[in-house]
Amino acid sequence: MSRAILQVMIRGRVQGVGYRAWVEYQATASGLEGWVRNRRDGSVEALFAGAPNHVADMVALCRHGPPSSRVDSVTSETAGADELNLRRAGEKFSVLPTV
């Protein structure tokens, strides 16, 4: 089975609205690995790894976000497996500190 790894940037009103917790829930429910974190510029960054169709579906979900968010843009690019090393030990999906 092939595996996709995408790094995603989400911009808009995506901090202070439960966006990271929502991403963690959706990604875990989809069986994805990776992480999500706030960035100091007000965006949210995420890494999703898993079956290509599940990763694509997650990126599509990110375009909508939770009800209290407003997503202005979502961009993604292929990432290397080494990016998964940012996760906390023993976790498949982590909410990381702000960078």
From Swiss-Prot:
What Gene3D superfamilies is this protein classified in? 3.30.70.100
Q: Which InterPro entries match?
A: Acylphosphatase, Acylphosphatase-like_dom, Acylphosphatase-like_dom_sf, Acylphosphatase_CS
Location of the Acylphosphatase-like domain:
5-97
Q: Does the keyword Amino-acid biosynthesis apply?
A: no
Q: List the disulfide bonds.
A: none
Active site positions, chain numbering? R20, N38
Sorted keywords for this record are: Hydrolase
**Enzyme Commission code:** 3.6.1.7
Q: Which GO terms describe its molecular function?
A: acylphosphatase activity
Query: In this entry, which stretches build a coiled coil?
Result: none
Catalysed reactions, as listed in the record: an acyl phosphate + H2O = a carboxylate + phosphate + H(+)
Q: Would you identify the family this protein belongs to, as annotated?
A: Belongs to the acylphosphatase family.
Q: Tell me the protein's name.
A: Acylphosphatase
Which organism is the protein's source? Answer: Bradyrhizobium diazoefficiens (strain JCM 10833 / BCRC 13528 / IAM 13628 / NBRC 14792 / USDA 110)
